[in-house]
Amino acid sequence: MQPKDLAKKLFSEKFNRTSELNVYAPGRVNIIGEHTDYNDGFVMPCAINYGTAVSGAKRDDHTFCVYAADLDQFDRFRLDRPIEQNPSEKWTGYVRGVVKFIQERCPEFTQGADLVISGNVPLSSGLSSSASLEVAVGKFCQQLGELPLSNTDIALIGQKAENKFVGANCGNMDQLISALGQQDHLLMIDCRSLETKATPVPHNIAVMIVNSHVKHDLVTGEYNTRRQQCEAAAKFFGVKALRDVSIQQFKEKEAELTALDGEAAKRARHVVTENQRVLDAVDALNQGDISRLGELMGQSHDSMRDDFEITTPEIDYLVELAQQVIGKSGGARMTGGGFGGCIVAVAPVEKVEEVRKIIADNYQKRTGIKEDFYVCTASQGVHLC
């Protein structure tokens, strides 16, 4: 059963009434532009046909009573008192954090509700289960309280909840694409100005996602370390963010930065070149040049492996297998925060079964882990359902 249907069904079972408000927000896959969002750079994701549904109805008090279907757990908190962490259950932080920061923007929002949350984005896969949850809860609150918040506002509140309440220093891409995604389009997002540019996905091209089932947890260490290294490099260049450094400027000072901090230099090289790759990818797509897009995806993966150092042997192997089949007809790369998670591959529809087969025949044999294979559709962002 799809999350939309399951959330409605479970709501009537758990609360003995019919839901009045149903919201759905998708997960996402990022085609190119990794670890560029928190450097004020460019990204090119699409919303996918996996996501989080919230079904609920008003209460006649100020309490939020939340049931997480996938975990079979309840959480209760009041909106007429300061919202605190619930240290025993991590998932509650995403919900409480969003409500807390909505109240910061709209202090009049104290309307209680019963709600059920159900999702089918694989957890810790790098497909943004957390952002789709935040955006779904944010939209639910906006509708519940008839609050003057745009979908962009909701996305930024979701990011703030993850940064300040959950403690993961993510950028804004995941929430923005979940809030603003367009059916059958990739969305190039300028993470500084928040401008977006939709580019259609050619109808004969498939977007495949393969979950390595090597788990990552961004709240711990490595992700936040990368962010600090990027900030240190920006400081070295005397700019607000690495977005402001061109490839030419980077090359001029690369040796100096390397002597000072070799790791920061490698991280900066990835971000500076990755921003350019996103802009080049938009041009390639507009010209229908999927071969060029694939080439850029390959360069992106190499840069994440060698300069940003966030891939794993299992992820590298999945990319290698997919690439053997795809050749110059598309591309494959790791997607998401890194240290496991998923790869994304873009190729003609007729290559899908061949890619699925080479991975099924080889990945588990080498790694001892069974992968999951998804063919995705570029989907609409958050909406009522």
Curated annotation (Swiss-Prot):
It comes from Mannheimia succiniciproducens (strain KCTC 0769BP / MBEL55E). ATP binds at residues 124-130. It catalyses: alpha-D-galactose + ATP = alpha-D-galactose 1-phosphate + ADP + H(+). It is found in: Cytoplasm. Mg(2+) binds at residues 130, 162. Gene3D superfamilies: 3.30.230.10, GHMP kinase, C-terminal domain (3.30.70.890). This is Galactokinase. Belongs to the GHMP kinase family. GalK subfamily. It holds the Pfam family GHMP_kinases_C. The active site is at 174 (proton acceptor). The record marks 28 as: Transition state stabilizer. GO terms for molecular function: ATP binding; galactokinase activity; magnesium ion binding. Substrate binds at residues 34-37, 223. GO terms for biological process: galactose metabolic process. GO terms for cellular component: cytosol. Catalyzes the transfer of the gamma-phosphate of ATP to D-galactose to form alpha-D-galactose-1-phosphate (Gal-1-P). Pathway: Carbohydrate metabolism; galactose metabolism. The keyword Ribosomal protein does not apply. Its EC number is 2.7.1.6. Keywords: ATP-binding, Carbohydrate metabolism, Cytoplasm, Galactose metabolism, Kinase, Magnesium, Metal-binding, Nucleotide-binding, Transferase.
